[in-house]
Amino acid sequence: MPGERRRFAQATKSVGVSWPAKVRRRDGTLVPFDIARIEAAVTRAAREVACDDPDMPGTVAKAVADALGRGIAPVEDIQDCVEARLGEAGLDDVARVYIIYRQRRAELRTAKALLGVRDELKLSLAAVTVLRERYLLHDEQGRPAESTGELMDRSARCVAAAEDQYEPGSSRRWAERFATLLRNLEFLPNSPTLMNSGTDLGLLAGCFVLPIEDSLQSIFATLGQAAELQRAGGGTGYAFSHLRPAGDRVASTGGTASGPVSFLRLYDSAAGVVSMGGRRRGACMAVLDVSHPDICDFVTAKAESPSELPHFNLSVGVTDAFLRAVERNGLHRLVNPRTGKIVARMPAAELFDAICKAAHAGGDPGLVFLDTINRANPVPGRGRIEATNPCGEVPLLPYESCNLGSINLARMLADGRVDWDRLEEVAGVAVRFLDDVIDVSRYPFPELGEAARATRKIGLGVMGLAELLAALGIPYDSEEAVRLATRLMRRIQQAAHTASRRLAEERGAFPAFTDSRFARSGPRRNAQVTSVAPTGTISLIAGTTAGIEPMFAIAFTRAIVGRHLLEVNPCFDRLARDRGFYRDELIAEIAQRGGVRGYPRLPAEVRAAFPTAAEIAPQWHLRMQAAVQRHVEAAVSKTVNLPATATVDDVRAIYVAAWKAKVKGITVYRYGSREGQVLSYAAPKPLLAQADTEFSGGCAGRSCEF
């Protein structure tokens, strides 16, 4: 074998350089020939079989390039030539791995072809499946009418059209810059911006908060507005706190009120009906103030029946006064919102225990820290914030909207280090993109457009934190990870502020600037610039981990196009192949376990760098959320995962710690506490961890579509 390799290397040195100028891809497009791509493919195959000859990949790549000759080389011919040259060199093990890789890629292309999708972005099959069902435009026969790259181009062009309002003729230049970010998956906006750009719907904002006042007219008018928004793919959040309690007098009829929980059920049913004909499952948030007389019914609304309110996340709006009363075992007042009168007093600790027991049982309700939120309200003169969007990352005033986007941190690496310059550049362009979204989006009701333009709130966040940490070999549950996450979010927020100030110089400050807490500082284009969403489907499209969440499993099966396909975390897959310990049997065993911690067959540093959400202590979940929140103007959507053995006291401790850590909201999820959870490790016999088509690795318990 060594003699064959030496003769092969010597033979290749004598061949003259006459390489192809172009490569014809399978879709017929031409791209420049790049010998480095051949060398990289051979290097990956060599690493998997522990072939450590550093010169071999370059030698093989040169031999392939020489053999192809001048002109245009079809990609299949290039790959055939790689196989042949590996065989001639006696590198049978490397050739076998390369052949298997080709076969798997061919199977993936076949599956995508069956879906009728052209995918020049080389996305995962799960991503392509979701895009086909809900994002891509279709022709009259229901077939996809655009490719994955054309979807990104459509969104970029639509959003960049806003640029011509400020600098005529500049939209084409900015469309190209926006498209580069989207095609490279360095940044993606919330789903409606991808779905609805350039369509008749035209609604690009992700979520809205709608007001509900204490009258049937308001209740049903808001319900109608919510249906219209949900039909277009928008999520809705509500404060039910202004509705009179159950049993209260209704003067106009002489009857009694049914209370906020009854109308909450009505809203949930409507969301289910609307979503059946829409592009996304309805997702809503209901917040009820802790002082409302019906708070106990609200707290137990989902705990008593897991199938209740499937389209709603529930959060109790708690105040500092209530939580201080809990700490000192004081009394808590319940106040009728119609009259403003105290109707009852109860031990604060008793109510808090009921909240914690319900969350322990099924994940709801979470907490929204109203005083913490309103201390950071950028425009307090416009009102007190009482509700959030469905996932809790954006507290909003009535009729305000979320215009969200996330930087893919996994794409912010270069040569094994964070590319800080690129991170700041992407953040600056992303702020401009999101500001443009406000201008080009259509708003079904005038109040929505007026509220969006008055404060021009945007929410630039992140996804892929867990993948970035794993790629750097940093355990998620470590001081180093918390420090890096803090530094990342600080740099993003600083870059976002700089970009917003520059936009204010070009376009003017947001109209409500003089009434804002920034009035004495320099002008800003946006009242709010940062927010960390769970990212839902967009992290699936980007092929990375959700928001700032840990990985939910290292290997799992996903139901796609009628089959269950084994998926492996891409970062773990690369590491395992690079270090030569990748084996199909190993991956199948990991899939049965879900995670790799405590798995003795892997190196200790690998086990440490790839924790799953269920393997991380709750305190580390909260520490990460709190660290990121310190450099986020809106809020951070994050689930604190608890083991199945967690107690109600554990939930209580996390909720109190979250308040003291000054996060703006908190959600817990105890493993196994909800029927039909997406991810399952425990079974009477080994069972592969499973995910449905659209699960992206975020919260296993609460609803998130955004």
UniProtKB/Swiss-Prot annotation:
Was identified as a high-confidence drug target. Disulfide bonds join 207-402. It comes from the Bacteria. Belongs to the ribonucleoside diphosphate reductase class-2 family. CDD domains: RNR_II_dimer. The gene is nrdZ. It is an enzyme of class 1 (oxidoreductase). Disruption phenotype: No visible phenotype, even under low-oxygen growth conditions, nor in aerosol-infected B6D2/F1 mice. Provides the precursors necessary for DNA synthesis. Catalyzes the biosynthesis of deoxyribonucleotides from the corresponding ribonucleotides. Substrate binds at residues 191, 206-207, 235, 389-393, 534-538. Its cofactor is adenosylcob(III)alamin. One of its GO terms (molecular function) is ribonucleoside-diphosphate reductase activity, thioredoxin disulfide as acceptor. Its EC number is 1.17.4.1. Keywords: ATP-binding, Cobalamin, Cobalt, Deoxyribonucleotide synthesis, Disulfide bond, DNA synthesis, Nucleotide-binding, Oxidoreductase. Induction: A member of the dormancy regulon. Induced in response to reduced oxygen tension (hypoxia), low levels of nitric oxide (NO) and carbon monoxide (CO). It is hoped that this regulon will give insight into the latent, or dormant phase of infection. PROSITE patterns: ATP_CONE. The active site is at 389 (proton acceptor), 391 (cysteine radical intermediate), 393 (proton acceptor). This is Vitamin B12-dependent ribonucleoside-diphosphate reductase. It catalyses: a 2'-deoxyribonucleoside 5'-diphosphate + [thioredoxin]-disulfide + H2O = a ribonucleoside 5'-diphosphate + [thioredoxin]-dithiol. One of its GO terms (cellular component) is cytosol. Residues 21-109 form the ATP-cone domain. GO terms for biological process: deoxyribonucleotide biosynthetic process; DNA biosynthetic process. 5'-deoxyadenosylcobalamine (coenzyme B12).
